[in-house]
Amino acid sequence: MTIIVTGAAGFIGSNIVKALNQRGITDIVAVDNLSKGEKFKNLAECEIAHYLDKHEFIRQVREHILPYQNIEAVFHQGACSDTMNYDGLYMMDNNYQYTLDLLDWCQDERIPFLYASSAAVYGKGEIFREERELEKPLNVYGYSKFLFDQVLRRRMKEGLTAQVVGFRYFNVYGQHEQHKGRMASVAFHHFHQYREHGYVNLFGSNDGYGNGEQTRDFVSVEDVAKVNLYFFDHPELSGIYNLGTGRSQQFNELAAATVNACRAAEGKPEMSLKELVEEELIRYIPFPNALKGKYQSFTQADITKLREAGYKEEFFDVKAGIDRYVKWMLENLA
């Protein structure tokens, strides 16, 4: 049985491939666009059966000429995830139409389809639950994800021929994101800031939040891969699910966890947030005007629906997840 992973050389996709490998699954077709060549490193430690360029894959899907038999599932992680990309034509073709074509093909072939949606569909809301009235995207990236989620809702009412699951990823961090540049997680940037400068920067006060007090639902990519595989194991489940921890933690906590994990590797003692700020190991910079009105100062996944689907595993909190991530970066990137 063959499994297809799109975006396989990317951040979440490569972690799904790795998680499949840990189960002994290697009959995997990795689909990606390697024009950004350094992404190959994410797949170098993985076992796959074949690599297929994204554009060739799309062509074969649209013409129904993919040469693989007995496809067990498609994990669709290939998309433009740059929330600051305002090229609507590109975003809608790459994130919406590509996903729609894959959905149609998977339904025709009765293949389970698990795809990446995003918490960006909620915009600046304060309630993050999988309900239409709570979804107000702030940018074309969020809209591209929102629009496809509406397609799934309509298809579910009409009746599906095979499983379809959309995961609304919250703030994901972890190994294999180094190619993402400015779109990599804050934890990634803090690690490199601290190693290079000896301190990290956080946004100052904005939108009623104090220095570094803006909060996010930070979720480890290890947990994201586990949830994807849980639904792969349960093809009877379809729908749209938030994928976060259900906890909202301050950027201050993330920065402190990153700095302290780096300090621990240097044989230095853990410091409190107050001490880190006093010693200027955490510094605050003015909130950028370009982000005002477009920035989510608070996110927290309502994971009630995920739990009702039977997923019982606990999620890493920021400290535990960042400790693991920093150790990985020290071993692989430093």
From Swiss-Prot:
NADP(+) binds at residues 11-12, 32-33, 39, 54, 77-81, 94, 145, 172, 180. Substrate binds at residues 171, 182, 189, 203-206, 216, 295. Keywords: Carbohydrate metabolism, Isomerase, NADP. GO terms for molecular function: ADP-glyceromanno-heptose 6-epimerase activity; NADP binding. Binds 1 NADP(+) per subunit. It catalyses: ADP-D-glycero-beta-D-manno-heptose = ADP-L-glycero-beta-D-manno-heptose. Pfam families: Epimerase. Contains a large N-terminal NADP-binding domain, and a smaller C-terminal substrate-binding domain. Catalyzes the interconversion between ADP-D-glycero-beta-D-manno-heptose and ADP-L-glycero-beta-D-manno-heptose via an epimerization at carbon 6 of the heptose. This is ADP-L-glycero-D-manno-heptose-6-epimerase. The gene is hldD.
